[in-house]
Amino acid sequence: MYRIILMVVRLFYKVPYYLIRIWWLGTRKNFDLEKNYAFIKKVTKAANRAGRVTIESYGVENIPKENGFIFFPNHQGMFDALVFLESCPVPFSVVYKKEVSNVILLKQVFRALHAIAIDREDIKQSLQVINQMTEEVKQGRNFLIFPEGTRSRMGNQLLPFKGGTFKSAVRAKCPIVPCALIDSYKPFDEKSIAPVTVKLIYLPPICYEEYKQLKTPEIADIVKTKIEEAIRRYSCLLYTSPS
């Protein structure tokens, strides 16, 4: 919360414009994801800089060259989306939990990206989201979904991954891109405004041919293991030139 206040204070003269512009992007009829994403990326970089947050990205070259893939990162908190929005060079949308639908700025950003809200307590609605994401990925949209289903409150430790979150990838036969977030909980969860560095590692994609014979819980375990290994490896680095 302290860092959010810092961001707002340091950008107070721009915040009204940012909010109005993002709101407008999400409501106009001629939806243009690339233009929306470019502006939101610009705002995100400004907010992170104002909040004294540095993003280090690794493995950007692992992002598939062709659209129609899904990012599967670990989930540490509300700042996670801002890490990807600054770091990722290609537009993507997000599947987010319904509970954050009314968080200021986030809801405007999600609307501008045509993100999809999922109600974890409503099985029927969850299935509809899976089906919708499947069809949109087939059409070349990129998505991000958190396979833990909720954020871990144990720092860089992961919660169990839910196999059901991988159903869209299996049905769309698309690349699965595991992503490891390190210290993404610190900017918003710690009561501090001291400079902080967050790392994001894009791991090599898992192509459909590699997982088509596996059940979704098995895929979930493989992705979780890859992310845990990346967190252990990159957490030990004092400094590595990011990609």
Task: Enumerate the language-model features and the residues they cover.
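Residue-level preference for the first positions of well-ordered beta-strands
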Residues: 68-70, 142-146
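Conserved small/polar residues in nucleotide/adenosyl-binding loops
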Residues: 239-243
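Catalytic core of membrane glycerolipid acyltransferases/transacylases, capturing the structured
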Residues: 17-18, 22-24, 36, 50-51, ...
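Generic preference for hydrophobic
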Residues: 57, 71, 94-95, 200-202
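A cross-family acyltransferase "interaction/gating" segment
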Residues: 105-107, 142-144, 153-218
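Short low-complexity, flexible loop/linker segments enriched in glycine and/or proline
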Residues: 72, 109, 133-135, 191-194
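Short glycine-rich anion-binding loops that position phosphate/pyrophosphate groups of nucleotides
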Residues: 75-77, 148-152
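Membrane-anchoring hydrophobic helices of lipid-metabolizing enzymes
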Residues: 1-69
